[in-house]
């Protein structure tokens, strides 16, 4: 068995399986790796290898996730699959496994079920941009009309949550039969892989996005000015470019007059690098940790937003008691805590440890944010929850 060399030339795309318990997500994951390995080369992963997923800690939260990889001729995929419903909720909210697209698995024998709906809603809230449907267990349904009905229901459900239900690719297959090597069902897995290639666009790389650096520290260097340090989250900053300082106070413009890394001077700082950026005409006291340095106009400060949050269970080191409306924790964005108040949905009086919930947050100071930004909820420095900005309000 020759070891394949890792092809860096292929675009890398992150996907995952979502859907109701026992509809066949893990079987499908195994079938994809098996059929694609057989067709295009690569490694197959057996069902039981995927099913006993290792525990991971993301921001102090315990999540069971399996990671598999597979290739089509044009792309390399990293695929996540979770054994339990709670794991999906935590995974999607924390962004532990970011998905460029998801495969929604719906058993044709059952049709859409409560978790089908919940995973679609979560996908909408946390910004999963594309969903492809795999109708599973179609070998067990003889009635063509029933298949039509299930497909219609799934498309309606997607449309309800603002996904393009009418245009979403739907593949009718059987993960188990494909795994057992039956050619007509293997062909359905190849069809699914074709949709992964064609329907999910190549994700924009961090380096191609507008420049943003969360400020971790501020120094003044006599005779040179003020330096901010941090890790460039996205984009590139070049010496001589205009930048904005956003968040906590009024937005201020400045010019980058130097970039340094490990005491060496550079022409630019790129996504992923820890750099110091020298700013023209800015006083040390004008700027603080928690603000961001960004390409002018690319990000705005906000105080009010709709969010999807997961509250840690007692076992995860979270609260031991529920909280109620009027709860005022700190919200930790990038590098700093900001106090905020919450509004719970209509009819929800309290939130228990281990729950996930939609809530509106009002911060006492503005933070540079876009939809999809992750945050932690803290009480006196201890993490009690994780969340994602679903929609900026003001």
From Swiss-Prot:
EC numbers: 3.6.5.3
Q: Where is this region: G3?
A: 81-84
One matching Pfam family: GTP_EFTU
Which keywords, in A-to-Z order, does the entry hold?
Cytoplasm, Elongation factor, GTP-binding, Hydrolase, Magnesium, Metal-binding, Nucleotide-binding, Protein biosynthesis
| PROSITE patterns recorded | G_TR_1 (PS00301), G_TR_2 (PS51722)
Q: Where is the segment annotated G2?
A: 60-64
The positions annotated for binding GTP are 19-26, 81-85, 136-139
Which residues does UniProt assign to the signal peptide?
Answer: none
Highest taxon of the source? Bacteria
Catalysed transformations (reactions)? GTP + H2O = GDP + phosphate + H(+)
Tell me yes or no: is Cytoplasm among this UniProt entry's keywords. Answer: yes
InterPro entries in the record: EF-Tu_GTP-bd, EF-Tu_GTPase, EFTu-like_2, EFTU_2, G_TR_CS, P-loop_NTPase, Small_GTP-bd, T_Tr_GTP-bd_dom
Q: Where does Mg(2+) bind?
A: 26
Q: Give GO MF terms, alphabetically.
A: GTP binding; GTPase activity; guanosine tetraphosphate binding; translation elongation factor activity
Q: Which family does it belong to?
A: Belongs to the TRAFAC class translation factor GTPase superfamily. Classic translation factor GTPase family. EF-Tu/EF-1A subfamily.
Oligomer and partners: Monomer.
Task: Describe the task this protein carries out.
Answer: GTP hydrolase that promotes the GTP-dependent binding of aminoacyl-tRNA to the A-site of ribosomes during protein biosynthesis.
Quote the NCBIfam families the UniProt record gives. EF-Tu, PRK00049.1, PRK12735.1, PRK12736.1, small_GTP
Q: Please state what the protein is called.
A: Elongation factor Tu 1
Source organism (scientific name): Yersinia enterocolitica serotype O:8 / biotype 1B (strain NCTC 13174 / 8081)
Lineage, top ranks: Bacteria, Pseudomonadati, Pseudomonadota, Gammaproteobacteria, Enterobacterales
């Amino acid at each position: 068995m020759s070891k394949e060399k890792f092809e860096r030339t292929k675009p890398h795309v992150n996907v995952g399986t979502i859907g109701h318990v026992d509809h066949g997500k893990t079987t499908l994951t195994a079938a994809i790796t098996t059929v694609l390995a057989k067709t295009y080369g690569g490694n197959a992963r057996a069902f039981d290898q995927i099913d006993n997923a290792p525990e991971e800690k993301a921001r102090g939260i315990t999540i069971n996730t399996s990671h598999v990889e597979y290739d089509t001729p044009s792309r390399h995929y990293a695929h996540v699959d979770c054994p339990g419903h709670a794991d999906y909720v935590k995974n999607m909210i924390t962004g532990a496994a970011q998905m460029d697209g998801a495969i929604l698995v719906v058993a044709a024998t059952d049709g859409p079920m409560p978790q089908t709906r919940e995973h679609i809603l979560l996908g909408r809230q946390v910004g999963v941009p594309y969903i492809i449907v795999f109708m599973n267990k179609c070998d067990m349904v003889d009635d063509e009309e029933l298949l039509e009905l299930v497909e219609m229901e799934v498309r309606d459900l997607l449309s309800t949550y603002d996904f393009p239900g009418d245009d979403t690719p739907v593949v009718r297959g059987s993960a188990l039969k494909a795994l057992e090597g039956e050619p007509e069902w293997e062909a359905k897995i190849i069809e699914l892989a074709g949709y992964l290639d064609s329907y999910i666009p190549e994700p924009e790389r961090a380096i191609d996005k507008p420049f943003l650096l969360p400020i971790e520290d501020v120094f003044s260097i006599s005779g040179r000015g003020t330096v901010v340090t941090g890790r460039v989250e996205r984009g590139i900053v070049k010496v001589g470019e205009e930048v904005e300082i956003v968040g906590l106070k009024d937005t201020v413009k400045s010019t980058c007059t130097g970039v340094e890394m490990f005491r060496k001077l550079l022409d630019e700082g790129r996504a992923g690098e820890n750099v110091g950026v020298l700013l023209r005409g800015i006083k040390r006291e004008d700027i603080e940790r928690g603000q961001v340095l960004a390409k002018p106009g690319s990000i705005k400060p906000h105080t009010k937003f709709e969010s999807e949050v997961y509250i840690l269970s007692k076992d995860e080191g979270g609260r031991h008691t529920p909280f109620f409306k009027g709860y005022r924790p700190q919200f930790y964005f990038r590098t700093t805590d900001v106090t905020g108040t919450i509004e719970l949905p209509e009819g929800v009086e309290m939130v228990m440890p281990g729950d996930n919930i939609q809530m509106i947050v009002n911060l006492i100071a503005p933070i540079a944010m876009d939809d999809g930004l992750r945050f932690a909820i803290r009480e006196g420095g201890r993490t009690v929850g994780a969340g994602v900005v679903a929609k900026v309000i003001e």
